[in-house]
Amino acid sequence: MSSILNFYRNLLSVPLSFLVKNNPIPQQPIEELSLDISQPIIYLLPYTSQTDLIIIRKNCLSVGLPDPLEENELGGQCLPRYVFLDEGRRFFKSKGAKSATIQIVEKYLELHRSLPDLNVQLVPVSVLWGRSPGHEKQVGLPKLRLLNSIQKTAVAIWFGRDTFVRFSQAVSLRYMADEYGTDASIALKLARVAKIHFAKQRMSATGPRLPNRQAMFNKLLQSPAILNAIADEAKSKRISKEKARKEAYKILDEIAANVNYEGLRVADRFLGWLWNKLYQGIDVQNAERVRKLALEGHEIVYIPCHRSHIDYLLLSYVLYHQGLVPPHIAAGINLNFWPVGMMFRRGGAFFIRRTFKGNRLYSTIFREYLAELFHRGYSVEFFIEGGRSRTGRLLAPKTGMMSMTVQALQQNQIRPISVVPVYVGYEHVLEVDTYAKELRGAAKEKENAGLVLRVIRKLRNLGQGYVNFAEPITLSNYLNQHFPEWKDSQLEEHSQWFNPAVNAISNQVMININKAAAINAMNLTGTALLSSRQRALSREQLLEQLKSYQRFLQHAPYSNDIIVPTDTPEEILTHVLNLERVGLIVEKDNFGEMLRLERSAAVLMTYYRNNIQHVFVLPSLIASIIFHHGAIQKELVSNAARKIYPFLKEELFLHFSQDELDEYVEKIIEEFTRQKLILCAENLLSINKERVRVLQLWMAGVREILQRYYITVSILQDTPNIAKATLEKESQSIAQRLSVLHGINAPEFFDKAVFSAFIGSLRSNGYFDKNGVAITEKLNDISDILDRIISTEVQLTIKSAVGKHEEVQEY
């Protein structure tokens, strides 16, 4: 029988090797699932299928896992390396019978009694043939395990490129044997748990059935909230209810997605081609966090940072290839143009107007539509920044969508809602040239198909893309911990806890995104070159600085979630030089090579530096304090950092608490000492003159931020009772003057929003009295610190400008 079975497998292997693509999930199961290949592995398949077994074997061999068709030799016994959990239609009866599976697992368990060093890993693994969830009108979904061989051949031809092999977290049979014993009841219990696991896994990969769009519209238009909004619309505009209802339908049609599975498959092909054309690869980290939430039945809300229009496509593509359901995406109405709007809508996009304040009908319909998506179990994605960042930094969160998400949790507390912040990064952003023009005052060009094609056509070799899933926030857990009264309150936004809770969650999302920063070659090279006032360094200096950055990130990482490049400094520099449109010029003289940024490229490179500015801002602050003092007690460094930190924390969404700050400052000092950038004699910190150039370049990351703080603090010291609007305007005006006189290229340096945020931070940290007048005694503490770490030249420019402002006011 075994020879016939082997012949059958060999026969199947030939067409399957051509028809079915290797798509293991995760892509590196040994590393991502922490599998120990020095210990035996047994693969658990959900049902009897020689076709699935052959595909699993093909994927196992491609990722370095043991061959499932070979046996495990243990304690003088030869046991199969795979078992089938359940029956399925097949030509040959084999070890797939359920009773045989239980016996095999029981034998593995018994071996752990006689072999104390044995730890067999039971790895559940299944094949996903296509990912269509079906539609609501369908009576039942096709069960692929019930397909006969001819049907599966047809499925392989149609879905072969969309077949995924899903490896799950291993179960340690050593643990099971030690904790629960080795009899048949334990094997049966494992089988029952595995059945539930495979069912959940299938649901997490396909999601709930796709809605009948018209039926959903009819249901929503009959909801009490929308009926009331229609009645109010008819009354306020003096129109008939029927006309108001038609307007409501029109709004709903404008908003709602129209997901089409075949459309997703076509989009997957196109996006695969697009990434290969534009980027050298997509680095995905921590997807297992999301897979775990999906298996546990969480409603998932993805909240990525917003760098580019391509973010919409990238995250859906990544999720699809990680075995997860592409989400419904809240997209700006500006993207609803032909033919992109139709394609996005079929891929899961639902469209939102930029503003709908005062439009009760629209806001009610949108809120009810979002709640319906949550109720039906669809994952959702929205960009909390509200728009793409033109500067490379995170923008202040817009809380409207988060408010609706928290309201949806209140209305339906059956399934937990988890927010998954996502860091999206690129070594080259498609629209970065456009951003630079807009920051110089050019009008924003309206999105259209021609613009998209022009951008894509002229770009290629843009380096790497990065998607890093940050630490999730389960809303009910967060609210229970920080706002326990949320469960007892009414369903209304005006509850005392509601707005503070929404703001706190939104802020935590931004913090978690920054904790998951993906640091790349462009970020590091741009940071180093922009730290030089001439935007130029010798090759030796640049490589030395890159090496310093890398060592710091290894020994004093900003967080456990950040992605750090493992290439050598030489490889990093070579990679950047090989990218297109970088604007990095290599010049040679008698002393060697110089690397210089073109002036026009400096603003563009600032974008990439700003992506990771939060990672280096604290070491930059510590370097500045030590450098400008020459020698200073460690405690004074910590005190100064504590005073400045609250403002940096709010501006750059830093994650350290006040207690954690002291510990991290100590780590920074230890690392600077290890690199011999500073000297430490007992508690006295001083400059190491032999390495002073590297320390000077470290300082630059915080220089412009501190200069902005100094501008606002100086104005407040001069005029404590100045109006907020005037303070913002004067701060911006002086910053513009400073940028011209001192050659500051950072586009956010004189951004009014940044000054507004700093003033708000001063207020929240107690630097204004109850009448809105600045408390000069407290401001003097900040000013004293800034006086010592800002160059005299810059101070004089600022003080002179503040003095002229005062003269104008008096005049």
Curated annotation (Swiss-Prot):
It is an enzyme of class 2 (transferase). It catalyses: sn-glycerol 3-phosphate + an acyl-CoA = a 1-acyl-sn-glycero-3-phosphate + CoA. CDD domains: LPLAT_DHAPAT-like. GO terms for cellular component: plasma membrane. Pathway: Phospholipid metabolism; CDP-diacylglycerol biosynthesis; CDP-diacylglycerol from sn-glycerol 3-phosphate: step 1/3. Its EC number is 2.3.1.15. GO terms for biological process: CDP-diacylglycerol biosynthetic process; fatty acid metabolic process. It is a peripheral membrane protein. A motif (HXXXXD motif) lies at residues 305-310. InterPro entries: GPAT/DHAPAT, GPAT/DHAPAT_C, GPAT/DHAPAT_LPLAT, GPAT_PlsB, Plipid/glycerol_acylTrfase. GO terms for molecular function: glycerol-3-phosphate O-acyltransferase activity. Pfam families: Acyltransferase, GPAT_C. Keywords: Acyltransferase, Cell inner membrane, Cell membrane, Lipid biosynthesis, Lipid metabolism, Membrane, Phospholipid biosynthesis, Phospholipid metabolism, Transferase. Its main location: membrane. It is found in: Cell inner membrane. The HXXXXD motif is essential for acyltransferase activity and may constitute the binding site for the phosphate moiety of the glycerol-3-phosphate. Belongs to the GPAT/DAPAT family. NCBIfam families: plsB, PRK04974.1. This is Glycerol-3-phosphate acyltransferase. It comes from Histophilus somni (strain 129Pt). The lineage of its organism: Bacteria, Pseudomonadati, Pseudomonadota, Gammaproteobacteria, Pasteurellales. The gene is plsB.
